[in-house]
Amino acid sequence: MGLEMWLRTGLLMAILTGLLMGIGYLFGGPQIAFIMFLFAMLFNFITYWYSDRIVLSWYNARIVDEMEAPELYAIVRSLAERAGLPTPRVAIIPTETPNAFATGRDPKHAVVAVTQGLLRILNRDELEGVIGHELTHIKNRDILIGTVAAAMAGAIMQLAYWARWIAIFGSYDDRDDGGNVLAAILVAVLAPIAAMLIQAAISRSREFLADEGGARISGKPWALASALMKIEQAVRYRPMREGNPATAHMFIVNPFRGMSIAELFSTHPPTEKRIERLRKIAEEMGYVPNF
């Protein structure tokens, strides 16, 4: 699992490097392509070491201590011990859209982030199920590739945004022979596709595995199922408006549901299928599922 994670993370970095070099070549030839190569190396370095901070900053997430969130911290610490993990840091996102995600480069540098809305609508058992799900992502080392993919996809979408403006304003420049405008149009069209490919590197099956892990760590598969239903329903009526859709795969449920651009980044299996699997897990654990 560790080797697979490193290979997939390396592949993502190679894709970004190739994309930036291609853009540089389109706009300025080999010299600009080399400059973009150097920029890509720097970006890859920053992404590996600081992508968790980048993602947390997109949501104004604030790291809290045990004094500020005693019940949440107690749940995280207890379940982390049960999972054989170091206690991750805890962050709270100031939004009423209920959701949660885990980030970081490894279990020793992990953060579990939850929204204010999640703390408001879930009971303790349901919250334990959600935290167990996120801790499983940490234990399975999904967090590095997920966080790196989010940072890279976000950067690529920003490139597409800039390229659209270059294409618009460049078309009014009489000194432009049309080459840069054409290049900008190509970037504007192809960059979102590249972002989707990066998102596709995050397997939807990881959510099923995290659901199972969350159910077993918390010992309450019915509570996780109930939490998923509550979050899904809330997101349908109150999708997240802030943040970056490139991070959708990191959340326990896609928080941008209903926004057209978010569908490009949908990496979650249907919630109904996840709940059905939790029913089977409950039976395996000796419970009679009533959800």
UniProtKB/Swiss-Prot annotation:
A Pfam short name: Peptidase_M48
UniProt entry keywords in alphabetical sequence: Cell membrane, Hydrolase, Membrane, Metal-binding, Metalloprotease, Protease, Transmembrane, Transmembrane helix, Zinc
Residues bound to Zn(2+): H133, H137, E207
GO biological process: proteolysis
Membrane topology: Multi-pass membrane protein
Membrane-traversing stretches: 1-21, 23-43, 143-163, 182-202
CDD domains given in the database record: M48B_HtpX_like
Known EC number: 3.4.24.-
InterPro entries: HtpX_protease, Pept_M48_protease_HtpX, Peptidase_M48
A Gene Ontology term for the protein's cellular component: plasma membrane
Keyword Transcription regulation: no
Localization, UniProt: Cell membrane
GO molecular function: metalloendopeptidase activity; zinc ion binding
Family statement: Belongs to the peptidase M48B family.
Protein name: Protease HtpX homolog
